[in-house]
């Protein structure tokens, strides 16, 4: 989403020397390198020109030592300098805001959006990088002006994220965010001419995206964690229907999803959402059955093996590993045509 070469802004250039050197020979696809406190995930995917996306690598490395030292070892072992590379910003490191598209020329759009969102940010816009993505189907819809997503992140946050890669001589091509990474996964799940809602959950909360035609139409953060669902469980089963506390996390999640989907239907009546897909989590079958009884559309469990090729990566057949790497996989599936 945020293109690395565009980071050569005066405000950021004073903080860090960006060092992007095109490798002599590039491998196909994109590599996402995701740094966590205890591990490093590396995913290499090739999607352009393939009938089904191919996952060539989905590795886990224990994080020992400084970030730059780890990345230097990975660059050497995996020849990362011969790949196009990307990283994901963490939730909380950026803001994504839906705004009315300014009526300006395309090359003036980002500056106009910076001015428009200046009072919506939690930090000064002069200290931020800003990128934009159009929301399809909003041009003149119901008499409303076109809408777009504005993504903003502090220059200091971007600088800190890039620095270990720069120190390790790993060429970053783009910086992405989970909303658009999840869109890339959802693109593989869409029935022809229809949209799909995809819900991922982890111990930081939930992320719902609605996509159609490979484009992101709506996103929403949901304050229900995987841990809270694990700790709840069904209270009882009557007539093959799960009955849970109305104030519990299951019910809160169902209500948030229904409100989000109803809101989407009002905004985009021209887009038919075919189904809700749940990313793999603990107790996914229970959650699927619960939501299927409360939502007005089919609910399915995500199975990446049905839409991607990764036969040689045994670990990725484990649903727990799929959800652990879901957004890294999505970031590696990014194609320029989607932007």
Predicted regions and their residues:
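Hydrophobic/aromatic-enriched cytosolic interaction surfaces used to assemble or bind macromolecules
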Residues: 1-339
